[in-house]
């Protein structure tokens, strides 16, 4: 499970715990670790213009896909070394900034990452980014699920429509689904944008994806 831009917080730990109750070992890494230990932000991180938001953005804007793929390799090695975790296929899912990371992982490690999901992922079509998901769909062997909010300035419908066309042309296995009437962040229970029906659908689709592909 890959974090969104505001970083590691209790809300994400709760979501990881919920997934664990379905029978999965869940890793929730701090992807900002390269910036040092002081990368857990206060509630003000969600307020544009706040000092915490600016501090987070100074780290977030330096994030790119290739280093995160190196982190995924380390996580796969860690999973293999833990006796209590079954070896074999793994799933990766991400929210917001980590949506493209999850999809890129399925392309970079196609024999290991057999299921990947993006929820309101940003920059899924980015011609300037190495390993942008829209370029690597054809390398994926597993199943992908991409869930987009109908109202999302960070992932507008123009991008989603282009993504759908490229996804279909790639022949990749999976689905792109638009959640009607909801906004970016709909799955986060502690945020103003939370939408319970869409959030519960997110859990249903994620867990069913993993059950199909991780057994």
Can you say where each PLM-predicted feature lies in the sequence?
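N-terminal cap/leader regions of alpha/beta-hydrolase-fold enzymes
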Residues: 1-215
